[in-house]
Amino acid sequence: MIETSDIFNLLHNAVEAKNIGKKISQAKMAEDLDVPMRTYQDWRLGNSKPQAAAAVCKLLCELDDDEILFVVNKMRKLLGK
């Protein structure tokens, strides 16, 4: 079973890879997510496990690739990105 910390580490690394490997600090990522840096650190270390993250991951795993892209694009629009 995947741990919540694995989800956050995978996503953090994917965002860094998107930026051509340019490191993104935990402080910057926390700011972008609008959470305290300590909270984000705890998520990555597995000290705190937001239940919603695991639930969202499980839901996304139920979708096909094209359905995931559709959902992500909808979320981008809602976030204004």
Where on the chain are the PLM-derived regions?
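A short, Lys/Arg-rich alpha-helix, primarily the initiator
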Residues: 1-22
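Residue-centric detector for conserved, function-critical "anchor" positions
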Residues: 1-4, 61-66
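Short alpha-helical DNA-recognition segment
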Residues: 21-41
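Alpha-helix N-cap/helix-initiation sites
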Residues: 22-26, 49-50, 68
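A general structural motif at alpha-helix termini
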Residues: 33, 44, 72-75
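Short alpha-helix boundary/capping elements
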Residues: 34-37, 48, 64-65
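Short, basic-rich loop-to-helix N-cap that marks the start of a DNA-contacting helix
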Residues: 45-59
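Short, charged recognition helix plus adjacent turn
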Residues: 65-81
